[in-house]
A protein has these predicted regions:
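Basic, Lys/Arg- and aromatic-enriched nucleic-acid-binding interface segment
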Residues: 1-40, 44, 64-67, 88, ...
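Catalytic-site neighborhood detector that most strongly recognizes the C-terminal catalytic loop/helix
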Residues: 3, 8, 62-67, 151-174
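Short, basic (Lys/Arg/His-rich) helix/loop patches that form interaction surfaces
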Residues: 15, 19-26, 36, 72, ...
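Structural motif
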Residues: 52-54
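Well-ordered beta-strand positions in beta-sheet-rich domains
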Residues: 57, 69-73, 160
Length: 174
């Protein structure tokens, strides 16, 4: 009850992000977040040495929780973004600033996230991408234990009760 209410991206909003992706390379980060379910800090702190492009996974080695230390699969849809960021420059981090430096959350949020949301007429926070991923996985029928593994959850039912926001159509079809 005290948790901040989070709203996942709708199918239409996800399509909007896909349409806008070619206008700025930093928009790809939104899609990387949606399709991996990682926290924004986990993606910004991801080092290239922990990314395996050929096998399509990466290791989260620094996380908010112990369960958060995990291997995350890279969806085929977003593999090209990982490849571009990986070979972009000499920065040890996968995602970097235009100057090739490590991205701080505030810098990304203020310089890119907020302007993108305004430009696309969408109102979301980075953590909503995590909720979106979990909802997409649940709607696709992925086993809850597998979802927990992917997103780094341990507790009973946390993923279902806190994160799953089924689209009304999916609920009507159930």
């Amino acid at each position: 009850p005290n948790a901040i209410s989070r709203t996942p991206f709708s199918t239409e909003e996800i399509q909007t992000v896909w349409k806008w992706k070619s206008t700025n390379e930093y928009i790809s980060i939104i899609l990387m977040l949606i399709y991996t379910g990682v926290r924004i800090s986990e993606l910004l702190d991801l080092k290239k040495e922990n990314v395996n492009l050929s096998e399509r996974w990466f290791d989260v080695i620094a996380s908010k929780t112990q369960a958060g230390i995990r291997k995350v699969p890279i969806n085929q849809k977003i593999l090209p973004f990982f490849q571009v960021w990986y070979s972009k420059n000499d920065c040890e981090y996968l995602i970097s600033t235009p100057e090739g430096k490590h991205f701080e959350y505030r810098n990304y949020y203020d310089s890119y996230w907020k302007p993108f949301m305004n430009q696309m007429h969408v109102e979301h926070r980075p953590h909503d991408c995590r909720h979106t991923c979990i909802s997409l996985l649940a709607t696709a029928g992925v086993d809850e234990r597998m979802i927990k593994k992917i997103v780094g959850h341990k507790g009973q039912g946390v993923t279902q009760t806190v994160y799953t926001h089924f689209e009304i159509d999916a609920l009507l079809d159930a």
